[in-house]
Amino acid sequence: DDGKNQGEYSAIFYDKNKLEVLKSGTFWLSETPEKPSKGWDAAYNRVCTYAFFKIKKSGKKFLAMNLHFDHVGDVARVNSSKLILEKIKELNPQNLPLTLTGDFNLTDDTEPIKIISQSLDNVFYHSRKPHYGPVGTFTAFDVNTVPKDRIDYIFVKGFEVQSNRTINDRRENLLYPSDHFPILAEISFKK
């Protein structure tokens, strides 16, 4: 894991015809977030990637963050939640609207998710329209079981959530392209 060409990463996909990247970077979910590192009791190096965007048409700006929490370390996940909130304050002193997405490897009832939910809105609960699709997001590639555990999230601040959904992307050949269902939220800037 060198932080440049190999190792853990959490990509942010965007439409370059609609959005301009103003600044971007990555930090590690560890005691030394500025360099490739494994934090606390984590099994692997874990990261959060961020990008500040400007919407070309309107000029409005926002921060997008995407992460992958450890699947083993309880201490790492609690501390990662706290670090994320610290980094939001540090990176975003102008308090731009933001999205935080990723595989948190945790269910709603866990302390790390509760920590984040104190500062950011979970789109599952803050949507104008009811959630659509399966509640669970972790498939484990098992097409015979309906996923019950939601471990992937979209959190927002400064956005209104119009709708949110979990997309059942099982193929005709009964194979999943991932062990997680994609999740999607339709959001708009608060007025």
Feature-to-residue mapping (PLM):
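Structured beta-strand-rich core segments of catalytic domains in phosphoester-bond hydrolases
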Residues: D1-K61, T166-I167
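Metal-dependent phosphoester-hydrolase catalytic domains
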Residues: K18, V75, N79, K89-L98, ...
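Metal-dependent phosphoester/phosphodiester hydrolase catalytic core
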Residues: A43-N45, K54-V78, K82
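Hydrophobic/aromatic residues located in beta-strands of well-ordered beta-sheets
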Residues: A64, L98-L100
